[in-house]
UniProtKB/Swiss-Prot annotation:
It is found in: Nucleus outer membrane; Endoplasmic reticulum membrane; Sarcoplasmic reticulum membrane. It comes from the Eukaryota. This is Voltage-gated monoatomic cation channel TMEM109. Its main location: nucleus. Residues 105-135, 206-243 are cytoplasmic. One of its GO terms (cellular component) is monoatomic ion channel complex. The keyword Ion transport applies. GO terms for biological process: cellular response to gamma radiation; intrinsic apoptotic signaling pathway in response to DNA damage by p53 class mediator; negative regulation of programmed cell death. The chain crosses the membrane at residues 84-104, 136-156, 186-205. Functions as a voltage-gated monoatomic cation channel permeable to both potassium and calcium. Plays a role in the cellular response to DNA damage. Residues 34-83, 157-185 are lumenal. The keyword Lipoprotein does not apply. It is a multi-pass membrane protein.
Amino acid sequence: MAGAHSNPSWSRHLFKAVLMVLGALLLVHSASAQTHREFASPGQQKRESSADILTEIGRSLKETLDTWLGPETMHVISETLLQVMWAISSAISVACFALSGIAAQLLSALGLDGEQLTQVLKLSPSQVQTLLLWGAAALVIYWLLSLLLGLVLALLGRILGGLKLVLFVAGFVGLVRSVPDPSTRALLLLALLTVFALLSRLTGSRSSGTHLEAKVRGLERQIEELRGRQRRAAKIPRSMEEE
């Protein structure tokens, strides 16, 4: 039963990870291209366009998606996303300009150079779009790194658990064979067992806590389902009595 439940969960996590990788590559490619257009000088654009790895990855990924979904479908999706992103970026740009104007007036009233200090808030829609794309890419990459680190830590936990057991068995055999005095042997074995128990408690507390939390959540969902069934079952006799 455990294997039957673990395989679909692992496949779902893998599918989500693949989708997030594709999304991250698309976002980073779009953000990189937008950055070159908005924040770089024309000479820098010419120098970096030929040696941009993200651009090559984005082109390859776009060709792959065109093959899978079709050029027309990808064109419709990209145009829709661009229109939505441009509308959001325009609204944020207008808000930034309004905020910069208010802040400039307040700073000027205080005797400061408000126009110069609020220049950073005057973002065009294209610049806002670039910042949003990089922010979305950063969030996706953060999620991927969290997932990868979770898998690595889980694997390291298994490896450390096996290594801990091997070291305990080796220490146990070494103590039994090398310590002739029964009293000293008993004390050393007690110390070894204490260390092993403490390590087991420290390393297993987090995993057991998350496992218990998952069980509690499952029980809460089952209780809610039972309550819903009881309510529906209680409504049926009332409706029959009214009829």
